[in-house]
Regions:
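Oxidoreductase and adenylate-handling cofactor-binding alpha/beta cores
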Residues: 177-183
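N-terminal glycine-/serine-/threonine-rich beta1-alpha1-beta2 phosphate-ribose binding loop
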Residues: 2-141, 153-168
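Short strand-turn motif at the edge of the Rossmann-like AdoMet-binding core
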Residues: 73, 146-148, 172-175
Length: 183
């Protein structure tokens, strides 16, 4: 056996393979490394109208769903808007997403955004119908807290807006043991 022949890998080959291995991390998409990938078509970008306790509670529920992104919140109370933005920003950082959450005093401005897919309506009860109708007319999916409306006319107007807008509108309904029929 020749003296200059060595077993194993040469330093030059080791450095070349190491550089190739490290370069592969810049080529691979991040989802292939961490195992999580949500297609853009599977993401739902939410906007919240009404940032009181119910809106924050609903955010907590929605935040546990994969593919949910929160883009904006709206409330007439500036303190609630600021609290919401802080909470969303902290959640986005925890998720490894660049923090960005816009806040609005007037919901009509938020409804003009094309990047928002769905709206959560958690306003005081007497605003549910109007905000839901406007959100449907803006082409947004809507999740509305109960009660949906105070009058049959409001309810019918909401249905018409949902059908005309071609988007689903859902609402909260609690289920308890007393709601069950039979066993």
């Amino acid at each position: 056996m020749k003296e200059n022949e060595k077993k194993g890998i040469s330093r030059r080959k080791f450095l070349g393979l190491s550089a190739l291995g490290l370069a592969s991390f810049t080529i691979l998409p991040s989802w292939s490394i961490n195992g999580v990938r949500i297609a853009p078509s599977d993401r739902v970008v939410l906007g919240f109208i009404g940032l009181g306790q119910q809106g924050l509670s609903d955010f907590t529920s929605f935040s546990n769903c994969p593919g949910v992104q929160v883009a904006a919140g709206c409330d007439v109370d500036s303190m609630k808007r600021e609290r919401f933005v802080r909470r969303i920003t902290a959640w986005q950082k925890q998720q490894g997403v660049a923090p960005r959450c816009d806040s609005y005093e007037f919901y009509e401005e938020m409804l003009e955004r094309k990047d928002i897919d769905a709206i959560e309506v958690a306003t005081p009860d007497h605003w549910h119908a109007l905000t839901t109708i406007h959100a449907c007319q803006a082409g947004k999916d809507v999740y509305c807290q109960k009660p949906l409306a105070y009058t049959i006319a409001e309810g019918l107007a909401m249905v018409k807006a949902g059908v005309t807008g071609g988007k689903p509108a859902t609402f909260e309904r609690r289920v308890s043991e007393s709601d069950r029929v039979g066993s």
